[in-house]
Amino acid sequence: MSKPANNLQDIFLNGARKNRIPVIVYLTNGFQIRGIVKGFDNFTVILECDGKQMMVYKHALSTITPSKAILFNTPAGTDDRS
């Protein structure tokens, strides 16, 4: 069985996580969360904010803005979410 290709969402979040790029997460209710992506799955994103961990459900996310550009030239087949 072949492994599915990475989608842009996974590449973006994995790039932010691996490079410890600070992000601003905008929720659908307008609230902003500033932190570092620690992990993610199909339904949630784990952020570290002020030394604390926060789990945010993806259905509540509006926008994620990184503090610097995230490169999308990840080699195929490198899905490392942990």
Curated annotation (Swiss-Prot):
InterPro entries found in the cross-reference section: Hfq (IPR005001), LSM_dom_sf (IPR010920), Sm (IPR047575)
CC annotations in GO: cytosol
UniProt entry keywords in alphabetical sequence: RNA-binding, Stress response
One MF annotation (Gene Ontology) recorded for this entry: RNA binding
Pfam families reported for this sequence: Hfq (PF17209)
PROSITE patterns: SM
GO biological process: regulation of DNA-templated transcription; regulation of RNA stability; regulation of translation, ncRNA-mediated
Sm domain residues: 10-70
Assembly information from the UniProt record: Homohexamer.
Xref: PANTHER family: RNA-BINDING PROTEIN HFQ
Family membership noted in the UniProt record: Belongs to the Hfq family.
Described purpose of this protein according to its UniProt entry: RNA chaperone that binds small regulatory RNA (sRNAs) and mRNAs to facilitate mRNA translational regulation in response to envelope stress, environmental stress and changes in metabolite concentrations. Also binds with high specificity to tRNAs.
Name the record gives this protein: RNA-binding protein Hfq
Source species of the chain: Clostridium kluyveri (strain ATCC 8527 / DSM 555 / NBRC 12016 / NCIMB 10680 / K1)
Gene name linked to the record: hfq
